[in-house]
């Protein structure tokens, strides 16, 4: 018979044998390197390199790196879809050149589609990477046929943690970058964006950034040359910061347009340290009036700070009759709700187009116009600085003249 003491001693022996000795190997904590893929370029515009790139995304997209090497051209003859990317690092050091085919692109939404992706770095580490939308033929066709539907170069919808940096983007058929679909946490930094036509047909509708339904979007250190909005805060934009940006030839930093056919809201947007050159306006708000199928426009907590105005037609503009004529708006006045709109620290000189007027602030008579202006030191070439006002508050902060329109 085995005594209780014997059982206890045997148990201790078993425990001592089960316990690991100090000489045993510790668990491996070595960090495994990210998978890396370099797609093979076809070397000819007759070969579509999109399948090779998407195969690389499939192979290395889950936490890996895809490299477009320097001094190499990849010809993209179809839509590039980032499906399969999750925390992937897509490095463009060479050239991604899209086909100019107007037949192929007609009706397409995007040239580069980033849909519901969680974690993407689209960047050039060396600063040499270029994405060419090859949009000249699309601009020429649109000049002849305004029904021609052109794609956005980079279309981001849904997803989160998107970073785009260090790249040059050029000549999109339409908008450069669109962010919508409740995207969150998107950053765009150190970019050069230019749309330049070599014909008499302007690169119409080449907004640099259309920021729609999204939260926590940052745009910084970007140089833009285009023929439409520099940055447009579209319906649903919330917590968007734009800083250290220069725009040439654009329509400015714009809220809107809002309220065309639905109730639209933009809130918590901040634009700071902006240089606007030869643009139709440096900054402004565009809302449709009441009546018809138009909805209610609401803009809350929008700040425009430290703008340098160089040859822009207006330094600041509020349009409450956007998209309609004066006769319509007399019967259906603007009803937009503008709350917490701050304009401060504007300096520089406008163009001579509206001289002596430097700003045109036409708030809707049926709406709310909570706007304050301070440190506004913009002048027209003549040296005058006339500000046209309509339905603005008595504590606006600047001296007003009648005659506001738009």
From Swiss-Prot:
Subcellular location field: Secreted
EC code(s) of this entry: 3.2.1.-
Residues the record marks as carrying a glycan: 244, 273, 278, 301
Gene Ontology biological process terms from the UniProt entry: cell wall organization; polysaccharide catabolic process
Function, as annotated: Pectinolytic enzyme involved in the degradation of xylogalacturonan (xga), a galacturonan backbone heavily substituted with xylose, and which is one important component of the hairy regions of pectin. Activity requires a galacturonic acid backbone substituted with xylose.
UniProt entry keywords in alphabetical sequence: Carbohydrate metabolism, Cell wall biogenesis/degradation, Glycoprotein, Glycosidase, Hydrolase, Polysaccharide degradation, Repeat, Secreted, Signal
Protein's UniProt keywords contain Secreted: yes
Top EC group: hydrolase
Highest taxon in the source lineage: Eukaryota
Active site, renumbered: 228 (proton donor), 251
Keyword Secreted: yes
Family stated for the protein in its record: Belongs to the glycosyl hydrolase 28 family.
GO cellular component: extracellular region
Position of the signal peptide: 1-18
Main location: secreted
GO MF terms held by the record: polygalacturonase activity
PbH1 repeat coordinates: 183-213, 214-235, 237-257, 266-289, 299-320, 368-390
Organism in which the protein naturally occurs: Aspergillus flavus (strain ATCC 200026 / FGSC A1120 / IAM 13836 / NRRL 3357 / JCM 12722 / SRRC 167)
Protein name (Swiss-Prot/TrEMBL): Probable endo-xylogalacturonan hydrolase A
